[in-house]
Amino acid sequence: MEESSSRNTNYSEDEENEELSSRVWIESKKLWRIVGPNIINRLAGYSMTVITQAFAGHLGNVELASISIATNIIVGFGFALLLGMASALETLCGQAFGAKRYHMLGTYMQRSWIVLFFCCILLLPVYIFASPILKLMGQSDDVAEQSGMVALWLIPLQFSYAFQFPLQRFLQSQLKNSVTLWFSLAVLVLHAVTSWVLVYELDFGVVGAAMALDISWWVWGLGLFWYVSSGRCPQSWAGFSMQAFSGFWEFVKFSAASGVMRCLEFWSYRILILMTGSLEKATLAMDALTICMTISGWELMIHWAFLVGTGVRVANELGAGNWKATKFAAMVSMAESVFIGLCICVITIILHDKLAYIFTSSTDVVQEVGQMSYLLAMAILLNSIQPILTGIVVGTGLQAWVAYINLFCYYIIGLPLAFVMGWIRHLGVSGIWGGMIFGGTAVQTVILAIVLIRHDWEKEAQKASQRAKKWSTPNPDNQIQEHK
């Protein structure tokens, strides 16, 4: 009975009557086929930045602050835009693959390369004038000068994003997750070795840490391109083509819409780092906040993988008209994500006075991070809930809801509350971060939960089935207009 139900995606009455443990096991296997490779891939990519910050942190507090601002603010400004615009391929390549128009995958990827590389050129002034921009934002002269110098060395990193992001989505749309997984693990090892050689053996210091990041990301991107161009994707890649310029403007508008929505969410937490630059002992405050946000972001990669898995499982079951299976898939994903989050939460509290030693040897920074450990634990707990709720909402096709909820929670409530707690209530860096956690992430989690509790799942399943029939067109180019 279990064997047949694991092969059948339809939620039958027999499945409903199975033992709960058996149903959970079957659903978990379906979920982890998606989540497992995504966790490793995301952790590897994020860990490269963590390794870079760790090497810089052991050089000194100013070095840690400068590499943190350069990677989180300067590079992060373009990272969010490029990542969001590349996410348009998740829709377009997925539709082309489903319609068996495999040649269009390569065409869409080339269009994305053109758009993203052009965006990189437009973003160059942010890197070139990083130092004066940071000074205008209130950063100290020593941190702003060194951050600007590091930013110049990170220009190749931005172009590597434009090259690698479309490649990842091109492969993922063809269910080749294992390819990106193994490449990411290999590059992670390479990055650790390269960082050690450049920072310590060749004594390049913080510049060496930035160079290692450039090298690792370009090796990752070129490795994926070698896989694609070496004949392993014969139906979807036939080389470069002028067809990439056909329908180019519609593609630009579709990509830009995805990019703007991603930026609104991503930039809100980066603004916090700039806000701490105006506090007393700004370098200490920025170092502590950066370490806490880095640990939180590291752990968040696990739950972002759950977001992807939940969205796929919910979309699959809704598309099949199985609204009961949709609710069950959502509950299993939520339970497993929260369990992982609670475990990491407990570890964080136990090791609250030791976590910062990964990034720095400064006693003052370690003590400041220790004082913020309970906020870090709360952020980790919310990380285990909020992405899953987002994945469920996105899986139901309510992406616009998520965008408006994010805008309201982070910019209308979160950032103003962070300002009040940090300056008016004089709670410093803990108040700034706490204001965003409770005013932004916590409120967003509650609103998403209310939306889902009040949701009519049976009606949504009917709408999803109708939508699938409507969008089952042989020409994916035409679907750009329907998504707008």
Would you name each region that the model predicts?
Residues 46-65, 134-141, 197-204, 259, ...:
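Helix-terminus/linker motif at the lipid-water interface of multi-pass membrane proteins
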Residues 24-47, 151, 155, 174, ...:
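Hydrophobic faces of transmembrane alpha-helices in multi-pass small-molecule transporters and flippases
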Residues 50-53, 64-124, 128, 164-173, ...:
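Small-residue-rich hydrophobic transmembrane alpha-helices
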Residues 77, 125-126, 141-167, 182-183, ...:
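Alpha-helical transmembrane segments of multi-pass membrane proteins
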Residues 24-27, 177-222, 226, 284, ...:
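Membrane-interface helix-loop junctions in multi-pass transport and translocation proteins
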